[in-house]
UniProtKB/Swiss-Prot annotation:
Domain KRAB intervals: 8-79
Protein name in the entry: Zinc finger protein 684
InterPro entries: KRAB, KRAB_dom_sf, Znf_C2H2-type, Znf_C2H2_sf, Znf_C2H2_type
The organism of origin for this protein: Homo sapiens
Coiled coil: none
Zinc finger (C2H2-type): 159-181, 187-209, 215-237, 243-265, 271-293, 299-321, 327-349, 355-377
Any one annotated GO CC term: nucleus
Name of the gene encoding the protein in the UniProt record: ZNF684
GO MF term list: DNA-binding transcription factor activity, RNA polymerase II-specific; RNA polymerase II transcription regulatory region sequence-specific DNA binding; sequence-specific double-stranded DNA binding; zinc ion binding
Keyword Isomerase included in the entry's annotation: no
CDD domains xref list: KRAB_A-box (cd07765)
Length: 378
């Protein structure tokens, strides 16, 4: 069996540079190189390996620049033969695994430098270093696989956000993420001044102004601004019902109808009104509801004096005086005072009919139309 001393030499862990390669390193990188070479040398000495104090070690110890091997193959002219063997007696012999760990940590220093400066010295500067990694792979125990560690380390995310700590492999993704913190919105609409962080979002928004509707239904000719809207609309023609209730198996064409149905299974209404029997999930909701029976209206409009039982109703009412319409349709730009009015309006664009009759299955876009229809059955 090959002895441990024979399997690893100083040249196995040495990193050689040509003159051209050395010029590419800055001051900090050269300092790191000196530290790495000295630590490799000391690690081998500490386990009793026969080491020749090479020219590079002597120069590093004296504070001079290390040797730079001329030629394409740095290993063809070895400086080890220029100096005699230097032994350090009395050094405690570490275990094989401890030695390998120390060498692994040494290589990690190099890898750390490579990651920080966004280039790989092992490929761009000196391909011979790959042989050093391979020589260690044979003698490393399974939990110290240097090549495996190297692969996982070098693909580590190099771009880290200073705000939240999230890291990215690609600079493009990192820059795009940073905008979430800085809220930079460089893409501004020339028509209304609204700004967006991404150009694609601006392009989508501008369709509102130019009236572009590129997605046309082949069955009825109706056009839509977004492809997703066309896909939803086409369910009217195909009869597709992709939303299935896991509780009862009932299927639905529209996601809104499906969500409304699911709530009927999951919502527990434990608070019941003693006046009308209506149940509520929260006690606060029951308390607000009770005002309809008592006639209590504690919230009064300061402009017209009209009173309301809930603050939300008062806020909505005041928009009549201020003219505020915060809910705007992305399709046509029409604005509404209430969100419910916007949702009802959007159905005219999508063709959605979320209100379905339990008796005959006929669907309607407006709840009021469903109520009128149900009178036929009663």
């Amino acid at each position: 069996m090959i002895s441990f001393q024979e399997s690893v030499t100083f040249q196995d862990v040495a990193v050689d540079f040509t003159a051209e390669e050395w010029q590419l390193l800055d001051c900090a990188e050269r300092t790191l190189y000196w530290d790495v070479m000295l630590e490799n040398y000391r690690n081998l000495i500490s386990v009793g390996c026969p080491i020749t104090k090479t020219k590079v070690i002597l120069k590093v110890e004296q504070g001079q620049e290390p040797w730079m091997v001329e030629g394409a193959n740095p290993h063809e002219s070895s400086p080890e033969s220029d100096y005699p063997l230097v032994d350090e007696p009395g050094k405690h012999r570490e275990s094989k695994d401890n030695f390998l760990k120390s060498v692994l940590l040494t290589f990690n220093k190099i890898l750390t430098m490579e990651r920080i400066h966004h280039y790989n010295m092992s490929t761009s500067l000196n391909p011979m270093r790959k042989k050093s990694y391979k020589s260690f792979e044979k003698c490393l125990p399974p939990n110290l696989d240097l090549l495996k560690y190297n692969r996982s380390y070098t693909v580590e995310n190099a771009y880290e956000c200073s705000e939240c700590g999230k890291a990215f492999k690609k600079k493009f993704h990192f820059i795009r993420h940073e905008k979430n913190h800085t809220r930079k919105k460089p893409f501004e609409c020339n028509d209304c001044g609204k700004a967006y962080s991404r150009k694609a979002h601006l392009a989508t928004h501008q369709k509102i102004h130019n009236g572009e509707r590129p997605f046309v239904c082949n069955d009825c000719g109706k056009a839509f601004m977004h492809k997703a809207q066309l896909v939803v609309h086409q369910r009217l023609h195909t009869g597709e019902k992709p939303y299935e209730c896991s509780q009862c198996g009932k299927t639905f064409t529209w996601n809104s109808s499906f969500n409304q149905h699911v709530k009927s299974h999951t919502l527990e209404k434990s608070f019941e009104c003693k006046e009308c029997g209506k149940t509520f999930r929260y006690s606060s909701s029951l308390y607000k509801h009770s005002r309809f029976h008592t006639g209590e209206k504690p919230y009064q409009c300061i402009i017209c004096g009209k009173a309301f039982g809930n603050t939300s109703v008062l806020v909505t009412h005041q928009r009549i005086h201020t003219g505020e319409k915060p809910y705007s349709c992305i399709e046509c730009g029409k604005a509404f005072i209430k969100k419910s009015h916007l949702l009802r309006h959007q159905i005219t664009h999508t063709g959605e009919k979320p209100y379905e009759c339990n008796r005959c299955g006929k669907a309607f876009s407006q709840k009021s139309n469903l109520i009128v229809h149900q009178k036929i059955h009663t």
